[in-house]
Each structure stands twice: as structure tokens, then as C-alpha cells.
Amino acid sequence: AQAFPAIIRAKKILVLGDKKQFSNLQSYQATSIINNTYQNKLRKVFRENISKDAIQLERLASFNVKTSILDFFQRISNYEARLKKHFRGYPEHIAYCSKTFYNNDLQAIRLRTKPIKEVIHFENLKYEIKDEINNSNKKEAEHIIKQLEKIKSDKTSVSVGIITPFTDQQRLITSLIQKHKDKDYFEEELKLKIMTFDTCQGEERQIVFYSMVATKNKDKLNWIFPVDLANKDLEEYGDKKAQRLNVGLSRVQEKMYFTMSKSVEEFKNEIGNALRFINNIWASEEKLPKNKDLDPKSPMEKEVLQWFKQTPFYLENKNKVELK
């Protein structure tokens, strides 16, 4: 509805979007009663002046304020293409999203030149929630703030984001930051932004801390993330829980830092699959030649090695692959 005035004035229209990420928020939250009223009026005018054909009336359903521009134009587009290049993070950062949502089609442009431990980190605090309110975890919040203090003391110039599944945890971390003596430094120098998986679309940070909140005895992540994505057509259903997972795990540029209160093996459903997939990349030992082992007279060897390290086959089987 917002784009309609521009659409009727255009000679050519280029629509960019991704059905596996969130659609326009205002359209998603549009009032159903008002929307249905407009649709009923539209059907009446269409039947009286254009056609009563059932197929055409079915297509008329796309004239819906909750239908995204992307969905609307997919029915009548002359040409479609998928943009496969990923410029934000390293191959290891995007491997899960590429495999799960894009059939391993994403191609990370940036080549990792630092150890895997410097681009992915898992911290298990082995903590059980006690007096926290609702879906919050004070231990994880305090741990992340200590890491921010360390970044400041090391005088590291980076941008930082914090992403959590729960609004309660977002509020808790925000409250602790607001009371912190280094609040201004965090916000101005580190460009700190505290987000949920629902509010991080369009954002990117060099270091992203994930506060998962869940513990052994209290885990409500099934309300946030999908149970299982196997055999599910994400294009067809536009599952918001799946979109949430795809968006949240693709915001990082340099380092993913997962802060948890239990081991990755204890997480259930699809978020457990995601964490274990990324953890396997982080924990696996690389059995590849070092740069010093390559032939200095063959500069392409280094590039070929980097290309091989980006392949889905290698990322999923690092422990089993040895290259000499």
C-alpha cells in the first residue's frame, strides 16, 4: 500500500528482497479489520466491472495490505535473479544460513586469514536462573559487559552488537549498560546496539555477542525459534520463526561470541541444530597445509586453498578431511 503511488508512475520496476528474511513491519502489523474491509470493497467492484471468474478473483487476493511488494510482483515478474555474494562475514559465519536457507548458494567474498578461534567463540557459563524476572539471565548479561570492559581496556577499535531472543534480556542488558561508568564509551566508540532477533535486521557489527538466556531448567526458546526446518518450504510458508533465525545469525562481520548457560548439546529444536553446526566449525581441527607449506612459485595455491576452505563439504567435514 505504501509503494502503490510509486508503482503506478513507474515505467520499469526493480524489486529487491528476500522472503527468508522479515517483510515490511508496518504491513505485517496492519489491522486485519480495516484490511478486510478494503478487500471486500475491491472484490465487489471487481465482480461488477471486470470479471466474476474464480481464477481472477483468486489473484485479486494479492491486493492485500499485508502482501509484500516482493510477493506481489513475483506473480507478474519478467525476470528473477538471486544475489549470491555475501560481503559481510567470513564463510564460517554464513555457513549455517547458506546451508539451511539458501541450499549452499551463498558465496562469502571475504577470506578468513585469522584462526577460527578468533572469528567464533562459545562460552558456557554453566548457570541456572534464580531470581531473574521472566526471560532474563543476569549472569550472561554481566559476562557480556565484562567482555565490553575488556575491549575498552585493550583499546580495540571495533563495533559491537548484542543479540538475544528475549525482550526481557534486552531490557536487562540495556539497564545495566545505562548504569555503567563506561556507558558513553560503549555507545559512542563501540557503536553498541542491544537487539533482539526480531529487531536486528539491517544491522551489522564487527563483534556480535549472543545471549541465549536458556538454562537446563528453564528454556523457552521453542516460542522464539522453529522446532524443525527439515522438509519445510521456507519460500512457501514465510515462517517468521525461521526468518528470525536467518536474520539474527547473519549480522556479524568479524566475530560471533555465543554466551550460554548450558552446553550446545542441551539446546533443543532448530536453534540447537544451528548452535551445534556452528560449534562443530569452531571446535574442529583444520588438517590443511599452512601458508609456509605452499609453493611460493605458485601463487594460485594459496587462493585454491582458500576456495576449498569455503566449500560446504569442507565446513561440514573439517575433522575428516586432510589435505597435503
Annotated model-derived regions:
Residues 100-178:
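Conserved helicase/translocase motor-coupling segment
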Residues 153-161, 170-190, 195-250, 262-267, ...:
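Conserved helicase C-terminal RecA-like lobe
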Residues 2-12:
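Short, conserved "post-DEAD/DEAH" coupling segment immediately C-terminal to helicase motif II
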Residues 75-121, 263-265:
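Coupling/hinge elements of helicase-like and P-loop NTPase modules
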Residues 18, 83, 202:
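Active-site glycine-centered loops adjacent to acidic/histidine catalytic or metal-binding residues
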Residues 1-4, 24-27:
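Conserved ATPase-coupling elements of RecA-like P-loop NTPase cores
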Residues 25, 29-81, 220-323:
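Helicase C-terminal subdomain and adjacent C-terminal extension
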